[in-house]
Amino acid sequence: MSLYRDEGVVLRTSKLAEADRIITVLTRDHGKIRAVAKGVRRTKSRFGARLEPFMRVDLLIAEGRSLDTVSQAESIAAYGAAIVGDYAAYEAANVIVETIDKLVGTERERMTDQYRLLIGALNALAKRAHAPQAIGCSYVMRALALAGWTPRLGTCVVCGAAAPAYLSIASGGVMCEADHTTDARRIAPSALGQFDALVHGDWTVLDAAPVERVVRELVEDWGEYYLERPIRSLRLIDS
């Protein structure tokens, strides 16, 4: 049984048997993996608390046929401890881990940029760097942009005209009055500016005012369209 070492962020866990857990982790070098953490539900477990959601850990893993097994786990950053004490941050963290979990398959494909974006977002939540809602919404748009779904927001996707007044999720960006499709929704300049700031992580804009409801709805709809399934945690952050 071969061993490999990597660092990663725990996305979610599920119970297995009486004392074990299956953990889903986005790693730096091996993409998303699922591994068995044996005995972690026992009170005397060596590393149970290190393998909770939102924790960044250094792992030694034994490769298996269907599931790997965690042999060692050392904490790198305990984001979870800082996040769970703040409900708004906890909601945003759930949006973040649900998004990356649904975005990334388990093909062990290395995706360093996605990993860096993930730890950056969780670190910002833990440090209260910005409003949790803005961090969560910006993460969704930036993660999808890294996957190739960046909205075109400067000029009409049909004719290239400036001063667009509509946004079509299916068409991938903004549209002018003359060329907008039936699915396109009218968008005010202020909302378009916030949406663009979420895509590019422009915190000067995002720190100036709370994210508008219409913009949060755009993030939710954009995510559902391109992931082909809803990000359910976003519905809570928007309520």
Curated annotation (Swiss-Prot):
Protein keywords: DNA damage, DNA recombination, DNA repair
Keyword DNA damage set for record: yes
One GO CC term on file: bacterial nucleoid
Signal peptide limits: none
InterPro entries the record matches: ARFGAP/RecO (IPR037278), DNA_rep/recomb_RecO_N (IPR022572), NA-bd_OB-fold (IPR012340), RecO (IPR003717), RecO_C (IPR042242)
BP GO terms, sorted: DNA recombination; double-strand break repair
Keyword match DNA damage: yes
Gene3D superfamilies in the record: Nucleic acid-binding proteins, Recombination protein O, C-terminal domain
Pfam families named among the record's database cross-references: RecO_C, RecO_N
General function of this protein: Involved in DNA repair and RecF pathway recombination.
NCBIfam families in alphabetical order: reco
Similarity field: Belongs to the RecO family.
Protein name (record): DNA repair protein RecO
Organism whose genome encodes this protein: Bifidobacterium longum subsp. infantis (strain ATCC 15697 / DSM 20088 / JCM 1222 / NCTC 11817 / S12)
